[in-house]
């Protein structure tokens, strides 16, 4: 198949879907749109980007607004109990016309999918296709040769493209294919994330809250859109780099919730339903380059493959 550009990334594909002269292909390994979980915080300036698609006000109407943050620490009288110690405005005045908001990543992606379907190109995502490898040939109108695997049938196909943009995350296969190397280290610190419906007497359950206990760790509490659901980021402590998989197996949904309940003492947390759960470790790494042209080749040719996104 010949596809002038091919993209792995929804924001960029949505932008290009407005141009009938540009043929774009959006490839996603999952078998369908994201339903729950993953990222949920949207900075003011990101909302401005969605407004460029005409979606900013729709997003703001649906989302939870983060107007302030409260802080809880161990009580000086009884360090087994927490108490509120501070309250601050979440974003400074004049930063943006839009607020800092919280909304499910699946909703954001659905906004963009709907935008693409209604665009001049009527662009649709291709689900169930996994990136395998690519190579850039020296000549030809479509020099980037990409191999894709159909997840359902395990069959492979080849796509020729003028350009490829890989927006496939921290473990980017596109980045690996062009030989770019991430610099930095995984911070050996883990967090459990739980989206839940719960009954609680904690007074700030509908405010963004940073909660520190004396001995049980820390929680970042994020209210979710809709008025009922809440997300807890629960501090799970340090990880032995050689025991990452065992660490994940040890920290189950139940154990993470139990940790959160201990952090919140003297308040109670009765979890009624868990919508999503994950354990992840914090890391900050940056790739040494963002395209397929090494520094020593920059005067010889223009790039054909790019990596972008988070």
Q: Residue locations for each model-derived region?
A:
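FAD-dinucleotide binding site
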Residues: 21, 61-74, 79-86, 93-94, ...
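Residue-level marker for buried hydrophobic side chains located in beta-strands
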Residues: 25, 274, 305-308
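A conserved short coil-to-beta-strand element within the FAD-binding core of flavoproteins
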Residues: 127-144
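Active-site-adjacent segment of FAD-dependent monooxygenases/related oxidoreductases
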Residues: 35-122, 126-128, 213, 222-224
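Beta1/beta-strand and adjacent pyrophosphate-binding region of the FAD-binding site
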Residues: 1-8, 25
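Active-site flanking residues adjacent to catalytic metal/cofactor-binding acidic residues
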Residues: 27, 167, 194, 308-310
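Conserved FAD-binding catalytic core of PHBH/FMO-like flavoproteins
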Residues: 114, 163-286, 294, 300-303
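Glycine-rich FAD pyrophosphate-binding loop
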Residues: 12-40
């Amino acid at each position: 198949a010949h596809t002038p550009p091919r993209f792995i990334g929804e924001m960029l594909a949505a932008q290009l879907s407005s141009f009938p002269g540009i043929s774009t292909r959006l490839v996603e390994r999952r078998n369908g749109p994201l339903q729950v979980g993953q990222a949920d915080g949207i900075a003011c300036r990101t909302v401005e980007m969605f407004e460029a698609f005409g979606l900013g006000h729709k997003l703001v109407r649906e989302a939870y607004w983060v107007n302030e943050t409260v802080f809880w620490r161990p009580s000086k009288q009884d360090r087994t109990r927490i108490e509120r110690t501070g309250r601050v405005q979440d974003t400074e005045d004049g930063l943006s016309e839009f607020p800092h908001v919280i909304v499910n990543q699946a909703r954001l992606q659905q906004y963009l999918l709907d935008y693409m379907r209604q665009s001049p190109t009527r662009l649709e995502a291709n689900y169930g296709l996994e990136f395998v490898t690519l190579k850039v040939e020296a000549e030809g109108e479509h020099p980037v040769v990409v191999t894709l695997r159909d997840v359902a049938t395990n069959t492979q196909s080849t796509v020729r493209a003028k350009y490829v943009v890989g927006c496939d995350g921290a473990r980017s296969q596109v980045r690996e294919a062009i030989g770019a190397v991430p610099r930095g280290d995984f911070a050996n610190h883990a967090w459990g994330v739980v989206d839940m419906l719960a009954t609680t007497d904690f007074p700030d359950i509908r405010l963004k809250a940073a909660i520190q206990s004396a001995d049980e760790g820390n929680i970042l509490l994020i209210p979710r859109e809709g008025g009922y659901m809440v997300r807890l980021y629960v501090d799970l402590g340090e990880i032995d780099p050689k025991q990452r998989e065992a660490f994940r197996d040890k920290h189950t949904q139940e154990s993470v919730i139990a940790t959160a309940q201990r952090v919140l003492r003297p308040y109670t947390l009765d979890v009624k339903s868990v919508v999503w759960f994950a354990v992840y470790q914090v890391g900050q790494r940056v790739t040494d380059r963002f395209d397929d042209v090494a520094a020593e080749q920059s005067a010889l040719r223009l790039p054909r493959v790019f990596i972008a996104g988070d």
